[in-house]
Amino acid sequence: MSSSMNVATMQALTFSRRLLPSVASRYLSSSSVTVTGYSGRSSAYAPSFRSIKCVSVSPEASIVSDTKKLADASKSTNLIPIYRCIFSDQLTPVLAYRCLVKEDDREAPSFLFESVEPGSQMSSVGRYSVVGAQPAMEIVAKENKVIVMDHNNETMTEEFVEDPMEIPRKISEKWNPDPQLVQDLPDAFCGGWVGFFSYDTVRYVEKRKLPFSKAPEDDRNLPDMHLGLYDDVVVFDHVEKKAYVIHWIRLDGSLPYEKAYSNGMQHLENLVAKLHDIEPPKLAAGNVNLQTRQFGPSLDNSNVTCEEYKEAVVKAKEHILAGDIFQIVLSQRFERRTFADPFEVYRALRVVNPSPYMGYLQARGCILVASSPEILTKVKQNKIVNRPLAGTSKRGKNEVEDKRLEKELLENEKQCAEHIMLVDLGRNDVGKVTKYGSVKVEKLMNIERYSHVMHISSTVTGELQDGLTCWDVLRAALPVGTVSGAPKVKAMELIDELEPTRRGPYSGGFGGVSFTGDMDIALSLRTIVFPTACQYNTMYSYKDANKRREWVAYLQAGAGVVADSDPQDEHCECQNKAAGLARAIDLAESAFVKK
């Protein structure tokens, strides 16, 4: 849902992700049409969800139906994508995710990524959404202990390493996809690693100055890194109204390519069948009966008191005045209990706070529900992109007020100075892994509008050095200056002293590293963390004996502290950011729980 929608239209609006116009029309007309574009294969699905399939919109044969092309490719590559293209007018990303992951299977690694592109005037729905489930492999790291689960070979190994990020890197180095075959796929993430990197993964890089032994208390015991290797993904193209159902065949020599192709085709058929389920899963409609652009009530349950946070700000200012640092981001973690399911909260969040990086990620130990506005780092065809967002103002009630607040934001010396400082820090991070002279500031101090706030944004780019990979870029970027400070390492040392608990996923990153070597990692801001290991003896029943579990939701937010910061203002900024995110929980509870 576009953030530009008039607030008045949000009242009593039914969630529409359950029923598209094309599906609703089935109830109004008895006629239906089945389109089959895959030669030699008939469709035999129930009329409640008729199969609408095509290999390609164009008449040209795809790799799926061209075995000669596959045989030729197998001589020079060990990764081959096969896909089926289906019309998406009966299928939404939310429904596709629920087709692949059952409602009660909250421990199953899986993801749903969506996007709303920001603009100076309004936002628009991003072109692609991506869904994935059942990874072929998983890597889970806790400090220096790493567990690797190879689900295809049914093996599990455990080891202690200095840098767990080296494990997926070494596996990725063996990939050799055929560039011509990849060109047939949509310009989006189409398979590879997906997961999250916690803030504390910086300790793998800065072992001496930021050791785990000096880290704050780890009171949640969440993984520091979780990655799944997804051979199967579904990519929705919202412009062309179709979905690519993709499976990657990995040719490791254990099978002849003919057998690997046959197995891959059967796997693809099974994946398509899940999306054309005879009895599609039901998604509760829900009613949007809240003012979605309002902030929720302030959250009082924090890992620090108001006085403790303000005292930390005062100590940080002392270090700034002493010349130790220029700026630091101090955060606090709020806690809230809810009977709304995390997936229901995600459905609400995509209405309340649409952002460029919308994500629902089920990982080991936790579920992330995210609406991040900011890239942590992006690598595409050896071009590195860093987009600092710093400097924030609330949105106005109308266009005139928006313009006034935008002007005030760009004239605010404190906000602009902080932004320029972080742009310089971003240039430094990008410069560590780029070719000499290639770093550019392509955009400087533009305004981007989101549902509740507007930000000052800049874009820093550079060309990746020869011999380096996206994993080197990630190591150089984690964590970005907008969530740590400047100078970065010294600011993080002070964060260890001033914050009482480890940050975990907050201010780390989540996203994907594709089979092609591209990377798109979002900064874990505006991200709700639901630990899956937490159990409470507070189960109760609603009418119809529909049992619900009580979840604990963690909402963490920070404020940038500089020399002239006011401790009370910084505390209020943290509260306001968290309250805006908590609005999604309010909406989920009113729409799905309090019926």
Swiss-Prot record:
Keywords in alphabetical order: Acetylation, Amino-acid biosynthesis, Aromatic amino acid biosynthesis, Chloroplast, Lyase, Magnesium, Metal-binding, Plastid, Transit peptide, Tryptophan biosynthesis
Protein EC: 4.1.3.27
Sites where the protein binds Mg(2+): 418, 573
Tissues and organs where the protein is expressed, per its UniProt entry: Expressed in the central cylinder of mature primary root zones, including pericycle and early lateral root primordia, and vasculature of cotyledons.
GO biological process terms held by the UniProt record: L-tryptophan biosynthetic process; regulation of auxin biosynthetic process
Any one GO molecular-function label of the UniProt entry: metal ion binding
Binding, L-tryptophan: 115, 356-358
Transit peptide per record: 1-54
Enzyme class: lyase
InterPro entries to which the protein is assigned, alphabetical: ADC_synthase (IPR005801), Anth_synth_I-like (IPR019999), Anth_synth_I_N (IPR006805), Anth_synth_I_PabB (IPR005256), Chorismate_C (IPR015890)
Cofactor: Mg(2+)
Coarse class of the protein's main subcellular location: plastid
PANTHER family linked to this entry: AMINOBENZOATE/ANTHRANILATE SYNTHASE, ANTHRANILATE SYNTHASE ALPHA SUBUNIT 1, CHLOROPLASTIC-RELATED
Function statement: Part of a heterotetrameric complex that catalyzes the two-step biosynthesis of anthranilate, an intermediate in the biosynthesis of L-tryptophan. In the first step, the glutamine-binding beta subunit of anthranilate synthase (AS) provides the glutamine amidotransferase activity which generates ammonia as a substrate that, along with chorismate, is used in the second step, catalyzed by the large alpha subunit of AS to produce anthranilate. Plays an important regulatory role in auxin production via the tryptophan-dependent biosynthetic pathway.
Family per similarity comment: Belongs to the anthranilate synthase component I family.
UniProt-recorded name of the protein: Anthranilate synthase alpha subunit 1, chloroplastic
Organism: Arabidopsis thaliana (Mouse-ear cress)
Source lineage: Eukaryota, Viridiplantae, Streptophyta, Embryophyta, Tracheophyta
